[in-house]
């Protein structure tokens, strides 16, 4: 089953077609990760799934109906989005930004309630930013800010959560913390997550469903253990590699071919061959130059 899907969509920016006749279905209750080389269309696909980009042709479906047919507030109650570059308003505190996640649930007949306050507090606690509630967002580190944005998305209480490169600009420690948090949301809260990631090894470790794209089309999709092979990596990324089991998780681990080592080995072999040829030539020259000995008796 799939609550969110794209059917034969054509996606374009500024008149340039990025993807054509593209179809994907996000499995319910999955942590789906979209991977592929730069400019392959993965972020474009995510924007279409989130209703940020209207397809030129085809349809994005939410619960069986075209996503564009729903009022924006209804979509915001069902689908949360963490864009690639989020900028907080000047002078806003962590608690105030997270509280904005409750806006889709407000209206003329429903104002801020104790339930909203409880959800905001729970969202900050779940992302580890409760102690930062009174801090200004622009004073925080990159990892802390990313957690705050995720807390705001959590406060929407949507069953679907889309994240566009949530680990961009973070160091390795904060990357793992954010991905661990996403895994917890999927495993413990039953949310369906869709994320765009650049790191294939991170994707293979955390995803339950992987979509590999190249040139605006889906090359392969399925469980990482079923589809991540050396052949797929070379086909999608143009990278020669070996795929082994991750010693920590047993998931596929991509080990790039040692190109520098191979180049050094080739260089050493060529140097040895050149020295051998030079040595042979020197020996021949010396023999030719050696004066003849006395005539034999």
Residue ranges of model-derived segments:
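Helix-to-loop junction immediately C-terminal to a conserved catalytic motif
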Residues: 50
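Conserved ABC transporter NBD signature motif
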Residues: 58-66, 75
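ABC ATPase nucleotide-binding domains
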Residues: 237-297
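Conserved ABC ATPase "signature" region
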Residues: 99, 114-132
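Conserved structural motif at the start of ABC-family nucleotide-binding domains
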Residues: 4, 18-21
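Conserved ABC ATPase signature
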Residues: 111, 136-140, 144
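Catalytic Walker B motif of ABC-type/P-loop ATPase nucleotide-binding domains
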Residues: 161-165
